[in-house]
Amino acid sequence: ALGFALDERAVATALTTQVHEHPVGVFRVRLSLAHSGAFKLAVAELDEPVCNWRVVIAEESLPANDYLRAHKTTVRGRCDAVLGQWAEDVFDAIFLNEQGEVCEGARSNVFIVRDGQWLTPSLKCGLLPGVMRRSLLESGRAVEQVLYREDLLSVEKIYLANALRGVIPVRF
C-alpha cells in the first residue's frame, strides 16, 4: 500500500533463524522495513505482565484522516511523547480525534463493554486496524461503533488489545 519493497523469503529466513536462537521463553519481534526493502529484526524478551493496567485519555487529539494511521509505522512521535508524560504505572493513553471520537491507544486498540456488547471504534475515526482487533471483529465478539469520551467514562468495562499482549482489562 505504501510502495515498500519486500523480500518475503529473506524475512522468513531471518525469522526462522531468530526462532532457533531463542528456543525457550516468550519474546517479541519487531520487523523494521525500509522503503528500499532493507529490514532488521529486533528481538527482546516480553516483560512480565502487569496486573493492574491503568490508562489515561490523551489531551492531544489525532487527525481522523491521516492515512498513515491505517498502517503500523515508525512515525509515532506524537504517541511516544504523550506516553512519556505519564508515570510508569500508566500502560497506555487513549486518543480521541478532532471530532471527539475515540480512536485508539498509543499502543493498542480500544474496546468497551456496554450492555454485554463489545464495541470498538470504527476505522473512519482514524486508527490502526490491529490484528487482535480484526480477530475480535471477525469472530463476532465485537462490533464497530463511533465512541466518545463519555462512553469511556460510563461503561461497565474497558479493554485494550494488541497482538503482543492480547486483550487486557484496564481502568482509569
Where are these regions (language model features)?
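Helix-start/capping segments and mature chain N-termini
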Residues: 1-28, 32-172
